[in-house]
Amino acid sequence: MKPGIHPEYREIVFVDVSNNFSFKTRSTMATKETIKWEDGNEYPLAKIETSSESHPFYTGTQKIMDTAGRVEKFRQKFGSKAVAKASGDGAAKTAEKKAAAAEAKAAEKPVKKKA
């Protein structure tokens, strides 16, 4: 390795500011703040907003989005406009044309039987 180009790998304390959970690990992160750790030594301090102690995935308090509620909000906001476009004459005519074309193709090709 070339000397002088790599960041310093050192012990650092991360503090989750949402619940004051802290842990010591090693990192190359540079900080100006320090904290006195349980062992009496002073370490660089990095403040984080989410850790394994506060993240919903790890705590089991995940919020499940109510998709039905989101659909209802959309319908209230756009209501008849969105429904009219989706079920308008154009959509019905296109569906009818596709069905007619499929029937015509099926009628043209005779079914071959294996002997």
From Swiss-Prot:
GO biological process: one example: translation
Keyword Ligase: no
Coiled coil: none
One annotated Gene Ontology cellular component of this protein: ribosome
Protein name as it appears in the record: Large ribosomal subunit protein bL31B
Subunit structure and binding partners: Part of the 50S ribosomal subunit.
One Pfam family it belongs to: Ribosomal_L31
Organism of derivation: Polynucleobacter necessarius subsp. necessarius (strain STIR1)
Entry keyword set: Ribonucleoprotein, Ribosomal protein
